[in-house]
């Protein structure tokens, strides 16, 4: 019935001293060394889907890297910093902190279509370095649009759904709601009921196709 927020950006990080510093260089390296890059993610979960879409966009072959289990952000940061895995994702603030101590290499960020270096800086409250540029800003045609939806039981009357949606749209103008989303580095936008349904259908179709291509879909 509505969209709570549009999700937020994730930093894509590599081990310190990695032979690639941005997405284009990562793409070239993977193509030249198929099967050698190790990506830490939640196998069968959201972050594997995220990286599958990224690697597919970079190389045309989502299976040209090795995906290994590494779920928590703490584990990802620790293992990337130690060089145990080559690539992972993490929050922008954590990437900033580890990068400042030269523990990781920041390749860029992946987030919703609305994400830019400028508005990400506004979200996290710091001036982000150019190394945090989004996939789109680096010329890579992929985004990670993961809306947080508000759902209602099946057969809920449209007038009730519309009323809930209107309340959510008004919330996007409330300062405490804005501040809360800023603290989580997530984007908000007022999306009407019809556009919300279309957004969910489009996102579902994309994820379904991606998961099916990975052989992870269970009927």
Predicted regions and their residues:
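Ligand-binding pocket segment of bilobal, Venus flytrap-like solute-binding proteins
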Residues: 36, 40-129
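C-terminal lobe and pocket-closing loops
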Residues: 95-172, 202
